[in-house]
Regions:
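Aromatic-anchored segments of alpha-helical transmembrane domains
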Residues: 16-20, 78-87, 138-148
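Interfacial loop at the N-terminal end of multi-pass membrane proteins
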Residues: 20-45
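Core segments of transmembrane alpha-helices
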Residues: 47-61, 81-85, 109
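Membrane-interface helix caps and helix-loop-helix hairpins in membrane proteins
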Residues: 89-100
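Terminal transmembrane helical module of multi-pass membrane proteins
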Residues: 115-157
Length: 157
């Protein structure tokens, strides 16, 4: 499958695999870094909302096959996969210990995002600079949130 309009349907599955890696230890890991921690319920709610958005974006692109839907997908995956991967990788390197989610970030999220991005450029004839800007804007909230968690011990919201 080379068509990003079909492969996007894997994104919800990848999110579930990522959450399966995070779930056993993320709340404890997070709460050891951030004074105003999170509960397991908040973790579940945030990931449930993320799953529903991912499902919606995947179905939107698969159903419409429109350039606008591809840009929405690039923005969302920029947040979900690119930004989230940067959070996990940066945390692991900066703190010198495993950040729950880093394995699926490296093995699933980053390769999928980069593949989807590259295929979307070709398939939708997107300008690379435009697609990069869309992905960067999408990733920005997660990058800011990650910075606050890892380097300031606080959360964005």
């Amino acid at each position: 499958m080379r068509d990003p309009c079909q492969v996007i349907l894997l994104a919800p599955v990848l999110l579930l695999l990522h959450v399966a890696e995070e779930a056993p230890g993320f709340v404890t890991w997070f709460n050891n870094l951030v004074a105003d921690g999170i509960t397991l319920q908040l973790f579940a709610w945030a990931n449930g909302a993320g799953y529903l958005i991912t499902l919606f974006v995947a179905m939107l692109l698969a159903g419409s096959r429109e350039t606008a839907a591809a840009l929405i997908a690039i923005a969302w995956l920029g947040f979900l996969m690119l930004g989230n991967s940067m959070l996990h990788i940066t945390a692991t390197l900066a703190l010198g210990r495993y950040a729950p989610g880093v394995i699926t970030s490296l093995l699933l999220y980053l390769p999928f995002f980069l593949w989807f991005f590259a295929r979307s450029l070709d398939h939708f004839r997107l300008r690379c600079t435009t697609a990069m800007a869309v992905a960067a804007v999408g990733a920005l909230p997660m990058l800011i949130h990650g910075y606050f968690i890892v380097f300031e011990g606080r959360r964005l919201v």
